[in-house]
Amino acid sequence: MKSKQEIVPNVTIAIPVYNVERYVEKALLSALEQDFQLPYEILVIDDCGNDNSMEIVRKLQSEHPQGNIIRIIRHERNKGLGEARNTSIREARGKYLLFLDSDDWLNKEALSILYKAAIEHDAEITIGSTLKVYEGSDKTETFVYPETFISKPSAGIELNVFRGITPLVSYWNKLFLLDFIKKSDMYCVHRIMEDVIPDFKAKVLSHKVVTIPDITLYYNERGGSIMDTLWVNDTKCQQTIDTTVDIIKRIKRMIQEDYYNIDGIYDIYFANLMRYFFLYEQLGVTQEQYPQVMEIEQNCMSFIPSLRYIHGRNARIMYLLLHRREHDRSDFFKAYRFASSRLGRMLKLLISL
């Protein structure tokens, strides 16, 4: 008879830890106190911070009644969230893998809800709904998805482009079949915006995707998080620009080499472009940084063969507005600002009537 330690877990919850002593206890307790009745493990990735985060983890490991399901993997040096995700993929023992960031927390029934849906549909990706909590205020925001099951090639594109269900670009709050992640080579390649390339591959390569309306994750929107510090100084701004340029190059190359004939692929590409144009607006890109930004601007619209390759009505309008101005740098950003403005949204509404 196998001992408890030898039992293969059904699910691995992976939690990266780096300088989160204010938050990690709540995150870890939410993982420890799941009502899930099958074996699962909690994999903590110690990314070599300099606060008391890991002391809190080790205390829970030794004192909590469920503490023996915690397993700690320590990096030899700080490697960033992307590599912490990769370590989780390599080290996970569960059939399914759920990422939990160390400043968020799970609904007590999250594993039960996600696992049940995954098993019922033999899904590669099972996506729960999210409640975003704004730290220090009563403000909340919900991201609730209808109950949906898609079984077809590139199921993630079908979900996003043709069903209009657009889960957040993230690894968290999604229960993944671990074999699917490995076979699809969904490893992170960047320190920031690390989930974008794996998310792109997930959309393209998935065959069975489930979304459920139940809130399974509480996402903590806090000051000082990685996303909030992307543009705090010139160095961070430059790092962000470098990363976005590389992401777009990688996505273009994957489309050109392997995915050019997939219906809806250019919608996914275009959505990423729009995300980065918005980011550049937030960054306040300087004249010195424009040459790199132009690597995305230059010919970015012409990479899309024609308007008929874009399916969403709003995306088609944005494409038309930007395509006419792509060779004029100043007009290009003016067009983006206009298309994103309230006036632009009003025009979209009028056109849709």
Regions found by a protein language model. Name each.
Residues 9-12, 30, 41, 197:
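Cell-envelope/extracellular polymer assembly enzymes that use nucleotide-activated donors
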Residues 20-33, 40:
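Short, well-formed alpha-helical segments that are part of the catalytic scaffolds
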Residues 30, 46-56, 77:
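A conserved acidic beta->alpha catalytic loop
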Residues 39-48, 71-75, 102:
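Short beta-strand/loop segment that forms part of the nucleotide-sugar
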Residues 75-92, 113:
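Glycine-rich, basic loop-to-helix element that forms the pyrophosphate-binding segment
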Residues 97:
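Short aromatic/hydrophobic "clamp" motif used to bind/position activated sugar donors
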Residues 102-212, 219-236:
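Donor-binding/catalytic cores of nucleotide-activated saccharide
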Residues 281-353:
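Membrane-interface aromatic/basic loop that binds lipid-linked glycans or pyrophosphate carriers
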